């Protein structure tokens, strides 16, 4: 499977020990399964990366509530659960780093199509801020990484590749570069990090320009985006 092949690739290219486990984070028990796996293997987790996510390729009114609940669990509840489980061991050691992959969308008004995505990412930023407030003085820092459009299989796997295809080339960033910057920022203990200069400027504009303007633009551009699906 994909995880197995990726693990083997890392072993060959970097000469490091790599292990893996397949977990479905829509399952409420998955975070504990992952934690127990690490404890059984006696792995010491000094850096916890929360990177699972996807997008829903349909409008809010057309998406079953069951799917919305799964979405919230993967992007939100599972992150909280994993942090709660692993942070206890970090506190015992007096050190640890947590990376939470958020998004530039956390700073933008909610899209008229991706109704939940932006608000969940905004919550993740605030949650990360809360972790820092409570545990920074005990050697634990949490970094909310807020990338923009990154070239991965995220959009194709989520069924929203047409959205990525319409993004100007200069706004698309390579995943290795974004990942490297994110890891460096997390190890430094940055509380929030926006990769690349392009998206730093975008976030600055999102903070300065009234949200009502972006809401208007979104309402004009978004209708019909997924009508063919």
Model-derived features: where do they sit?
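C-terminal helical subdomain
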Residues: 144, 165-202
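Active-site helix of classical SDR
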Residues: 83, 119-120
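Active-site-adjacent segment of SDR/Rossmann-fold oxidoreductases
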Residues: 13, 108, 130-140
